[in-house]
């Protein structure tokens, strides 16, 4: 056993490589052992340090891989499971346990998070050389019982299936202990680099090999001052010094100091000594000069994006200044990898800097995982429509074109069907020939055939199920689709997809191993496959060696690269405080460690935090050979953050904090990094002028479009793809002639008028271009309204010999049997329930009709308007016709006055502000149309709400009071002629604000005609502004702004071109109500008509 240590500015790898070469010269086979996170880089570093640049006698590897290079004899043939296979084994065993048998974990026994934690605990106990029976020492009885039961069942299952338990290292330990290694130990040597602690398992291997006479060399970084100090607690080198002291004591071997004498103390050595002195409470006088501050820079940036841009610009500048440099000379360290991952790709692609982030990617969000998840959902939830749509949207199932998938989705949404039997029926329903049923049925068979075959599978052996799954993948064209999708991708992306497919196949292989010979149902198989894929990870290797390597800062080793940029070093990220998220608490770990024998040790993360983090900081400060940049943003993940206390210490020693900002106000040579970055800087430069004009924080793309749009305008050019603000063009004369020929009548409906005043462009989309809403066969608000209308129409048309209740029930029965409504409301149990609710509404609304002796109904569903009678005449002599349908016309028995009724599914009232602004013209239009048809005597126009009144019992003292309050809401709401109001009963809400004199009535009709005239003139002129109305002057209601994706109108940017509703100009600021409010609006109407 040979122990070495060196100062942190001397390469430990160089020293240990020389030791390895000497051992090779003596005829030894050397295993150069590095930690898992550093083995790839360490191999390259060792090769660079070798005098011959290569050696067949030195193998750079990890502890876990050593067994591959040793000859193991007479070991039983067992299949080894990785984490995926182990996860499947846990899933299988937990599925077989009754939830009642598990007191703590019963309710979540198949939760992926629990399975992941059980796998981690399984590995931890293996590494710590602890038996599962040691869990008997847990004090929590319920947890102890559960964990013992789970691990006993899993262990028994693994033994029964001849599946290897434990790690590769535990198998090597077992082989050495049982003398099953035929390799000559005298010819083997271990050189161990980069460790500051061994796991119990790793220490056991070292101990066994040392006992077999294997020569072992272990090196670590430590200062002589720290190693020889009698007190190491809190020291920067505490982790490595305690590690060396433990080994020196155990093997009775003093550690040798291999530190080199440096001609001059560099900036990083100076920083290290100052930090060490600060933590061991010794005094040290060192001056930090300008050169040191240049070599070790501390940046303070505003945002993470700015940090990355500054790093990219710095790398580009250094490459430009020094042609000998390449990307591999740079290293980027991240305080939090997840927070920087997306921005990193965006900005480094923009600056054309190749990089490699050595991080495994989870398969959980890959389309292949979503594909399996969708099939599982189809099976588990009995073929829901949404699950089938999700399956098709993965673009992996069947080779259908996107247009075919869209057509199929649109049709099944129209049908609203769920369940396999419904999909198996031939598609026959269409909407006025809109759907190509022949093509849709071909698509239906193509989509269903592979799924039907797969879902017909019963519980069977795993091998047979895998064969059926393989057939399904071929018939469903999944492999073909994956292949086609990857052919169009770049080489790097193709490699990623290849790794994903390998991971997918590996999950299937592990399933075959774990469930060999077992009976498995299809649903269990899909659930296991999805669970395995959710746990799976994949990674790619860099396409070229010359890339900027990016990694988490806590994985860094000293003297890694010439230039190192460490970003995101906020208080939350540096130091990283390891949290215990396992199934065992720190207290339980401590108790288990005390109860078990020596050499058996579970890691307690909280006890390692301090020494680990200080050693990490030391490695970070010494990670660069030439220049180090440490940066912290003021805003991290959109919240305020402070820089790390370690950075503040460096500033205290004399290093300077530099406020770094991206300066877009001027362009300099630093912007000449690459074509894309220069373009970005130019846009940002021009953006400054735009920002000072608008003072709005806009995104890059929007600013770019506005800048380019402005430049094109100055040169008299136009690019319709990038408008500076949403605008529409006036329709051409020939287009208008085709749409509205002079000899053809021009019709405008009351709903069209309302749409026009909501947003002129919405009228253009719906009534000119004919944009339609997605069709639905299932009952909706429209079909509900038609159903209720038909019931009342029929009830009021039946002879009066029978009572109203009998007529209503007869109308309900006859209407329910109509083919149209029978098809809709017998479709499903949900539709039947909806029908029962609607019938209750009909019976409740009938209460008003039953007890209203003052009126009689003379017409139902009465049409008005047509070619015979023009509604208004335009200034150019052209007539505008209005046609529509009135739900009901009533007549007062007393004097024959006419009233108009419109049924509504919710409470609707006539509002003067909305009427004045063109948003409530329905009732005045009905009255005007009937007047033009010869009617002169009116008592009003009103809405009748068809709904069951809801009354809070808390607001009334008795049930009788609730009935009274409910009946108050069941009234006709609308406009009534003052002279006829005395004839109207209690069912009419005839307060003063709703009553009109003859002069007000005529004024109402005149202003309504004026609204139609203004709208018709604009429509016939082909002018449709993008001007959704705003009621409060701050936002646009969602039902007004339904076509945002088409118009591009955004309220927070384009509110200036919205239509602000006209309001009363109240000089004294008083709020008017009732009749005074009505009079104020009529005064405003008079002013508008007199202009």
From Swiss-Prot:
Superkingdom classification of source: Bacteria
Top enzyme category: hydrolase
SUPFAM superfamilies, A to Z: P-loop containing nucleoside triphosphate hydrolases (SSF52540), Restriction endonuclease-like (SSF52980)
GO terms (BP aspect): double-strand break repair via homologous recombination
Cofactor dependency: Mg(2+)
InterPro entries: ADDB_N, DNA_helicase_suRexB, P-loop_NTPase, PDDEXK_AddAB-type, Restrct_endonuc-II-like
Pfam families, A to Z: ADDB_N, PDDEXK_1
Keywords, sorted A to Z: ATP-binding, DNA damage, DNA repair, DNA-binding, Exonuclease, Helicase, Hydrolase, Nuclease, Nucleotide-binding
Transmembrane regions: none
E.C. numbers: 3.1.-.-
GO molecular function terms attached to this record: 5'-3' exonuclease activity; ATP binding; double-stranded DNA binding; helicase activity; hydrolase activity, acting on acid anhydrides
Record function comment: The heterodimer acts as both an ATP-dependent DNA helicase and an ATP-dependent, dual-direction single-stranded exonuclease. Recognizes the chi site generating a DNA molecule suitable for the initiation of homologous recombination. This subunit has 5' -> 3' nuclease activity but not helicase activity.
Family statement: Belongs to the helicase family. AddB/RexB type 2 subfamily.
Oligomer and partners: Heterodimer of AddA and RexB.
Note: Despite having helicase-like domains, this subunit does not have helicase activity.
Protein name stated in the entry: ATP-dependent helicase/deoxyribonuclease subunit B
Organism whose genome encodes this protein: Streptococcus pneumoniae serotype 19F (strain G54)
Originating gene: rexB
């Amino acid at each position: 056993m040979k122990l070495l240590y060196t100062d942190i500015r001397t390469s430990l790898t160089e020293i240990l490589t020389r030791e390895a070469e000497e051992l090779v010269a003596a005829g030894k086979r050397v295993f150069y052992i590095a930690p898992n996170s550093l083995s790839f880089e360490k191999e390259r570093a060792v090769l660079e340090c070798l005098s011959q640049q290569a050696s067949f006698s030195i193998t750079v590897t990890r502890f876990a891989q050593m067994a591959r290079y040793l000859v193991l004899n007479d070991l039983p043939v067992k299949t080894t499971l990785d984490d995926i296979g182990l996860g499947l084994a846990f899933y299988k065993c937990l599925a077989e346990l009754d939830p009642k048998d598990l007191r703590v974990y019963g309710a979540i026994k198949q939760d992926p998070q629990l399975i992941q934690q059980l796998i981690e605990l399984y590995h931890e106990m293996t590494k710590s050389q602890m038996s599962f029976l040691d869990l008997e020492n847990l004090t929590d009885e319920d947890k102890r019982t559960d964990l013992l039961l789970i691990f006993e069942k899993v262990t028994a299952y693994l033994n029964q299936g001849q599946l290897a338990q434990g790690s590769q290292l535990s198998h090597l330990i077992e082989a050495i202990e049982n003398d099953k290694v035929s390799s000559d130990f005298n010819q083997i040597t271990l050189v161990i680099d980069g460790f500051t602690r061994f796991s119990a398992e790793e220490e056991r291997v070292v101990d066994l090999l040392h006992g077999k006479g294997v020569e072992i060399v272990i090196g670590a970084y430590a200062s002589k001052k720290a190693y020889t100090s009698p007190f190491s607690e809190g020291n920067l080198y505490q982790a490595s010094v305690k590690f060396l002291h433990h080994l020196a004591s155990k093997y009775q071997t003093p550690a040798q100091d291999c530190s080199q004498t440096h001609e001059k103390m560099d900036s990083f050595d100076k920083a290290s000594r100052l930090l060490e002195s600060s933590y061991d409470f010794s005094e040290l006088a060192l001056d930090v000069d300008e050169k040191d501050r240049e070599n070790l820079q501390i940046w303070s940036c505003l945002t993470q994006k700015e940090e990355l841009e500054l790093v990219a610009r710095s790398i580009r500048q250094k490459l430009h200044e020094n042609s000998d440099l390449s990307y591999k000379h740079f290293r980027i360290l991240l305080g939090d990898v997840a927070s920087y991952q997306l921005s990193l790709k965006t900005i480094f692609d923009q600056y054309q800097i190749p990089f490699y982030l050595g991080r495994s990617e989870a398969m959980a969000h890959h389309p292949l995982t979503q594909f399996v998840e969708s099939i599982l959902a189809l099976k588990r939830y009995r073929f829901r429509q949404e699950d089938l749509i999700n399956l098709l949207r993965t673009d992996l199932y069947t080779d259908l074109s996107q247009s075919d998938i869209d057509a199929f989705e649109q049709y099944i949404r129209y049908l609203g069907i769920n369940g396999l039997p419904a999909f198996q029926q031939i598609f026959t329903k269409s909407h006025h020939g809109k759907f190509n049923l022949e093509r849709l049925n071909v698509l239906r068979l193509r989509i269903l055939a592979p799924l039907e075959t797969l879902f017909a599978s019963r519980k069977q052996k795993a091998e047979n199920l895998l064969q059926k799954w393989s057939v399904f993948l071929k018939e469903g064209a999944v492999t073909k689709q994956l292949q086609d999708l990857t052919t169009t991708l770049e080489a790097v992306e193709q490699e990623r997809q290849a790794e994903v497919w390998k991971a997918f196949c590996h999950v299937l292989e592990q399933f075959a191993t774990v469930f060999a010979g077992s009976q498995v149902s299809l649903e269990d198989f899909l659930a296991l496959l999805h669970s395995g894929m959710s746990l799976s990870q994949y990674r790619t290797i860099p396409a070229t060696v010359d890339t900027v390597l990016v990694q988490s800062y806590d994985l860094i080793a000293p003297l890694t690269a010439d230039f190192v940029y460490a970003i995101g070093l906020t208080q939350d990220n540096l130091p990283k405080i390891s949290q215990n998220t396992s199934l065992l608490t720190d207290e339980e770990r401590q108790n288990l460690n005390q109860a078990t024998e020596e050499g058996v040790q579970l890691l307690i993360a909280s006890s390692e935090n301090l020494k680990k983090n200080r050693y990490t900081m030391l490695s970070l400060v010494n990670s660069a050979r030439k220049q180090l940049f440490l940066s912290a943003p003021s805003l991290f993940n959109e919240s305020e953050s402070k820089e790390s206390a370690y950075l503040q210490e460096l500033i205290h020693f004399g290093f300077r904090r530099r406020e770094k900002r991206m300066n877009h106000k001027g362009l300099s040579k630093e912007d000449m990094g690459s074509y894309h970055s220069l373009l970005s800087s130019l846009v940002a430069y021009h953006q400054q002028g735009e920002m000072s004009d608008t003072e709005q924080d806009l995104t890059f793309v929007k600013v770019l479009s506005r800048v380019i749009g402005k430049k094109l305008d100055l040169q008299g050019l136009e690019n319709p793809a990038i408008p500076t603000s949403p605008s529409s063009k006036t329709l051409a004369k020939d287009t208008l002639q085709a749409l509205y020929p002079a000899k053809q009548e021009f019709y405008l409906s009351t709903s069209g008028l309302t749409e026009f005043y909501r947003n002129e462009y919405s009228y253009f989309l719906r009534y000119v271009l004919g944009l339609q809403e997605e069709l639905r066969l299932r009952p909706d608000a429209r079909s509900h309204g038609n159903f209720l209308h038909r019931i009342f129409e029929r009830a009021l048309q039946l002879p009066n010999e029978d009572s109203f209740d009998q007529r209503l029930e007869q109308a309900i029965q006859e209407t329910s049997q109509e083919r149209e409504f029978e098809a809709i409301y017998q479709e499903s149990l949900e539709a039947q329930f909806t029908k029962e609710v609607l019938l209750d509404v009909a019976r409740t609304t009938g209460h008003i009709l039953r007890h209203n002796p003052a009126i009689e109904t003379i017409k139902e569903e009465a049409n008005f308007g047509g070619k015979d009678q023009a509604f208004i005449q335009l200034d150019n002599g052209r007539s505008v016709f209005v046609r529509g349908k009135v739900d009901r016309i009533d007549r007062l028995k007393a004097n024959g006055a006419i009233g108009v009724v419109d049924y509504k599914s919710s409470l609707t009232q006539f509002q003067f502000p909305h009427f004045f602004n063109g948003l409530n013209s329905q009732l005045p239009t009905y009255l005007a149309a009937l007047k033009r048809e010869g009617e002169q005597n009116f008592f009003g126009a009103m809405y009748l709400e068809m709904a069951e009144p809801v009354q809070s019992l808390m607001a009334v003292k008795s049930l009788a009071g609730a009935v009274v309050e409910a009946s108050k809401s069941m009234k006709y709401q609308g406009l009534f002629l003052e002279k006829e109001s005395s004839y109207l009963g209690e069912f009419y809400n005839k307060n003063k604000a709703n009553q009109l004199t003859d002069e007000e009535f005529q004024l109402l009709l005149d202003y309504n005609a004026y609204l139609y005239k203004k709208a018709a003139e604009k429509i016939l002129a082909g002018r449709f502004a993008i001007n959704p109305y705003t009621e409060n002057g701050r936002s646009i209601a969602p039902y007004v702004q339904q076509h945002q994706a088409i118009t591009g109108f955004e309220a927070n940017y384009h509110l200036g071109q919205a239509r602000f509703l006209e309001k009363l100009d109240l000089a004294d600021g008083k709020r008017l109500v009732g009749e005074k409010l009505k009079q104020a609006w009529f005064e405003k109407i008079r002013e508008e008509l007199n202009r």
